[in-house]
Amino acid sequence: MDRMASSMKQVSNPLPKVLSRRGVGAGMEAAERESFERTQTVSVNKAINTQEVAVKEKHARTCILGTHHEKGAQTFWSVVNRLPLSSNAMLCWKFCHVFHKLLRDGHPNVLKDSLRYKNELSDMSRMWGHLSEGYGQLCSIYLKLLRTRMEYHTKNPRFPGNLQMSDRQLDEAGESDVNNFFQLTVEMFDYLECELNLFQTVFNSLDMSRSVSVTTAGQCRLAPLIQVILDCSHLYDYTVKLLFKLHSCLPADTLQGHRDRFMEQFTKLKDLFQRSSNLQYFKRLIQIPQLPENPPNFLRASALSEHISPVVVIPAEVSSPDSEPVLEKDDLMDMDASQQTLFDNKFDDVFGSSLSSDPFNFNNQNGVNKDEKDHLIERLYREISGLTGQLDNMKIESQRAMLQLKGRVSELEAELAEQQHLGRQAMDDCEFLRTELDELKRQREDTEKAQRSLTEIERKAQANEQRYSKLKEKYSELVQNHADLLRKNAEVTKQVSVARQAQVDLEREKKELADSFARTQEQQDVLENLKHELATSRQELQVLHSNLETSAQSEAKWLTQIAELEKEQGSLATVAAQREEELSALRDQLESTQIKLAGAQESMCQQVKDQRKTLLAGIRKAAEREIQEALSQLEEPTLISCAGSTDHLLSKVSSVSSCLEQLEKNGSQYLACPEDISELLHSITLLAHLTGDTIIQGSATSLRAPPEPADSLTEACRQYGRETLAYLSSLEEEGTMENADVTALRNCLSRVKTLGEELLPRGLDIKQEELGDLVDKEMAATSAAIEAATTRIEEILSKSRAGDTGVKLEVNERILGSCTSLMQAIKVLVVASKDLQKEIVESGRGTASPKEFYAKNSRWTEGLISASKAVGWGATIMVDAADLVVQGKGKFEELMVCSREIAASTAQLVAASKVKANKGSLNLTQLQQASRGVNQATAAVVASTISGKSQIEETDSMDFSSMTLTQIKRQEMDSQVRVLELENDLQKERQKLGELRKKHYELAGVAEGWEEGTEASPSTVQEAIPDKE
């Protein structure tokens, strides 16, 4: 973004100098007014836009100059009122930034012209305050600050927009009335509070954990804070001075509230200045002052001399090139306009007004034979053009350098004035310290005199005591005098202590004065350096003047050479006339050649047109023959041995639909441009080939379908072939080609597609485009189900340890541990299956995407989906069964059956994954090892369940010691009956299980994706079930 330019400088304001260069009067003509308004409108719209970047300084400066130009802000508000500030937070934020700049650096009448919109700004602030995100809250606080600023400057018109005032002007603003100073301090506190709120809100809205100041979004929010920093530095300085003035007039208790509020704002401002100085964005744009470590002590009047006004410095060298005023460049171009026009007129007088109308331009007359004079003229012309450009550039650069040096001189003068001001302030402080030093010396002399008089009095008292010891009255008088002298001695001693403390303070102030003198000396050294730089700049300016004079001499030399060339021009006129006669003869010859060429082109075009018709007719007849052959094969008995695929038929239909769209497009292109016939011929040939394949594939597919759908499909293919022949016949002539319509062909294709989709197996209900995503989702769901099962087993084990003891706890730990091992083995199996599937897809898809591979092999894909669902479902059911067994509510047999069912599901997943895998694949070997691990884990679950069941039954064995022989015989018979019933039920359940498995594999044979020759039978999956089953 653009950097802040010198219009915001705190030390000096260059706007009056810019305005003096412009010299625009108050009364503008209509054309000038229209141009001014157009320029201002463009600048305002460029400065206030919806892009999240900082406002460009050159646009903001143009707006500021416009206010000084028209002595107000009417044009600015007329443009802003057309912007949707209430509906776009970014526009409102940038408007606040630009308006803040105008209030600071614009014409004083900007405030008067803006007061009428104060209520609108308040309403807009309340509206944006309802938004807590984005720029809404920032806009609300910024608008509140601008309204407070307008009210403050309205109440205190003595304060300029940039808040730069001297101490005398600050005293005049309060009119030497303590009540006015008190109220002015309160208003400054409110003003500074609004500035700090905006400062804090902007920082809170930024993510300070990263380099936010180097992003355009961060710079957009940070850019207005430069104006805030300038305002805060002045407000803080004036607040300190006013508080010292109030403390000199009012009691300290009365100003306690002022001191508390100042302490709060001092802490905030110091923290914000510290944080701002660390940002990279501010380091290259502004030098932020640092506040003292401790706040001023207003209870000590001498602390005012320790206060240093914070000065914000904006380096001039950070101004970007695009921030230079456009007006200066225009003025620079106007300075050389007359000289350039004079040179162009002279050049036109010598060589003519333009190259195209020059009768002596030999390049157009004869581009082959050039004599030495022609080359000389061209070379001199190029050299003159180059030197002219160099001269113009040198003039522009010299003028730009002069303007830059003038600006640098102005900046150095401003810095010199500031240094002089600081020097005068240091001299005033020095004079104040000298006065205090003289006062302390006088007090010290008085103290020494009192001490000498005290010594004399004591001596006299001792003499009187010896002389008049016998006189009691005189003695009493002397005692009284002695007591008085003692009191005086105490007072003098106290004065001596005060004098000593003052002497210590004097020494400290002397040291501070010496430091102040040292700083002043350093500032004088800096001033000398600046003067040296100024002298160097002036020397460079003199060198540029000398270079300019040298360039003028070179220009005179070239004008002399041009005059000599002008003399040679007359001698070349004769040669030009001869060349003109030769050119006329060549033109006649060219006309006769063009006539012959036109006749040859017409005959060639006719031959090409006839060849295109012949080629189109031949391709069309060949296509008709191919389709007729396909139609004749519908009744051929040779197709009985062929087995078609519905998937293949649907893919052929899709290809034909795409070919029809391309054929329509190519036909339109051929009608628009008959020369481009290659694409049309290719589309006709491709349509005939695909149509024949579709008809033959439809007939072959109907052989495996039921009779009624087969007849419908055959008739639909036959009708499609007839419609295709009719369409090809309409392509015979260009007149009939325009009326050719493929709607009937599309209807026939839709009929074939509908019949084909009805013949698809029930397992293909899912869209083929979604199969790839569904495989990934099901595998992820299986992994998640296994993880959830493992977590739940751990929770069940924790509950069992907390509530069970003895044999039951041992059995539960063994069973749940084996279940956890089984879950881990299944997890390894699922990961190996994913790796193998990825390898299969990568090796088999070619240039197609994975989703297209899954869609192409839909049956195999749905087999994977079914196997994954079965594994996840089995893991959930086994965890439920284990939970019931641990609680004593379930059966051990249910847990064994669930573990075997998981083994069967994993075997199904292995079988589905092995269908398309290479036998030598490393991932296949890992999958088989994982499958064996699952079998072992399943056997461990069954073994731990049987062992636990045995232990539980041993503990629950019946006690027959108290039973009689009859009772034991009775229970024996009951047990035999129960055994027979259970054996009968077992036989029936085994038969039912066999029927269920048979029906399951009949229904899932197609849906589980095993292709022909590799379909898994029930025996195949059964062999993969562990031996323990």
Curated annotation (Swiss-Prot):
Tissue specificity remark: Most abundantly expressed in brain. In brain, expressed in cortical tissue, hippocampus, the molecular layer of the cerebellum and olfactory bulb. Also expressed in spinal cord and bone marrow (at protein level). Expressed in reproductive tissues.
Positions of post-translational Phosphoserine modification: 338
Q: Where is the ENTH domain?
A: 32-160
UniProt-listed CDD domains: ANTH_N_HIP1
Q: Where in the cell is it found?
A: Cytoplasm; Nucleus; Endomembrane system; Cytoplasmic vesicle, Clathrin-coated vesicle membrane
Q: What is any one GO biological process for this UniProt entry? A: protein stabilization
User: Gene3D superfamilies of this UniProt entry?
Assistant: 1.20.5.1700, 1.25.40.90, 6.10.250.920, I/LWEQ domain (1.20.1410.10)
Provide the primary localization. Answer: cytoplasm
Q: What happens when the gene is disrupted?
A: Mice develop a neurological phenotype by 3 months of age, characterized by wasting, tremor and a gait ataxia secondary to a rigid thoracolumbar kyphosis. Recovery of synaptic transmission following synaptic depression induced by prolonged nerve stimulation is reduced. Paired-pulse facilitation, a form of neuronal plasticity in which delivery of two stimuli within a second of each other produces an increase in the size of the second synaptic response, is enhanced. They also display micro-ophthalmia with nuclear cataracts.
- Keywords, in A-Z order: Actin-binding, Activator, Apoptosis, Coiled coil, Cytoplasm, Cytoplasmic vesicle, Differentiation, Endocytosis, Membrane, Neurodegeneration, Nucleus, Phosphoprotein, Transcription, Transcription regulation
- Relay the domain remarks: The pseudo DED region (pDED) mediates the interaction with IFT57. Binds F-actin via the talin-like I/LWEQ domain.
Role played = Plays a role in clathrin-mediated endocytosis and trafficking. Involved in regulating AMPA receptor trafficking in the central nervous system in an NMDA-dependent manner. Regulates presynaptic nerve terminal activity. Enhances androgen receptor (AR)-mediated transcription. May act as a proapoptotic protein that induces cell death by acting through the intrinsic apoptosis pathway. Binds 3-phosphoinositides (via ENTH domain). May act through the ENTH domain to promote cell survival by stabilizing receptor tyrosine kinases following ligand-induced endocytosis.
User: What name is this protein filed under?
Assistant: Huntingtin-interacting protein 1
The species this protein was found in: Mus musculus
Q: What is the lineage of its organism?
A: Eukaryota, Metazoa, Chordata, Craniata, Vertebrata
